[in-house]
UniProtKB/Swiss-Prot annotation:
Sequence positions that bind ATP: K11, F59, R87, T93, R104, N114
Identification of the protein by name: Nucleoside diphosphate kinase
Residues of the signal peptide: none
Listed GO biological process terms: CTP biosynthetic process; GTP biosynthetic process; UTP biosynthetic process
Originating gene: ndk
Enzyme Commission (EC) number: 2.7.4.6
Reported function: Major role in the synthesis of nucleoside triphosphates other than ATP. The ATP gamma phosphate is transferred to the NDP beta phosphate via a ping-pong mechanism, using a phosphorylated active-site intermediate.
Protein source organism: Shewanella denitrificans (strain OS217 / ATCC BAA-1090 / DSM 15013)
InterPro entries given in the database record: NDK-like_dom, NDK-like_dom_sf, Nucleoside_diP_kinase, Nucleoside_diP_kinase_AS
C-alpha cells in the first residue's frame, strides 16, 4: 500500500448546506488525513483555470457559474491509496447512481450540484494541489 496525496473540493452546494464537518468526518473515518484546508470563494478566472480541461465541453459555462456561486472548501488528503479511497468515499459522479453511504449518495442533489470533487489520478492530484496550495501550506501529519 502506498501513502498518497489527493485533492478534494467541497462544492458550493454542500458548503451552503453546512455539510463540511460531516464530509470531513467521512474522510477521517476512512483513514484519510486532512493535511491542508481552506475556504475560498473562487473567481471566474480561478474556476476557468481549474476546469480548463473541460473548456470545450457544453457544460463548462454552467460549471464555472456553479463553482463561483458561493464559497468552497479545498483540501489535501493523505493516506493509503488516497486517490482511490477518496473516489470510493465520493461515489458516482451522478448522485442518482451513487450508493447510499457515499458523499454524493447522501449529500448531492443533482449531477450539476454533486457536492464534491476529487482528483482522478496522482498526476491530476499533484496539479490540483499546486493550483490551490503552496508547499508551505501543506502540513504532513506525523502523529
Amino acid at each position: 500500500m502506498a501513502i498518497e496525496r489527493t485533492f478534494s473540493i467541497i462544492k458550493p452546494d454542500a458548503v451552503a448546506k453546512n455539510h463540511i464537518g460531516a464530509i470531513y468526518n467521512r474522510f477521517e473515518s476512512a483513514g484519510l488525513k486532512i493535511i491542508a484546508s481552506k475556504m475560498v470563494h473562487l473567481t471566474k478566472e480561478q474556476a476557468e483555470g481549474f476546469y480548463a480541461e473541460h473548456s470545450a465541453r457544453p457544460f463548462f459555462g454552467a460549471l464555472v457559474s456553479f463553482m463561483t456561486s458561493g464559497p468552497v472548501m479545498v483540501q489535501v488528503l493523505e493516506g493509503e491509496n488516497a486517490v482511490l479511497a477518496n473516489r470510493e468515499i465520493m461515489g458516482a459522479t451522478n448522485p442518482a447512481e451513487a450508493a447510499r453511504g457515499t458523499l454524493r449518495g447522501d449529500y448531492a442533489a443533482s449531477i450539476d450540484e454533486n457536492a464534491v470533487h476529487g482528483s482522478d489520478a496522482l498526476e491530476s492530484a499533484a496539479r490540483e494541489i499546486a493550483y490551490f496550495f503552496s508547499a508551505d501550506e501543506v502540513c504532513p501529519r506525523t502523529r
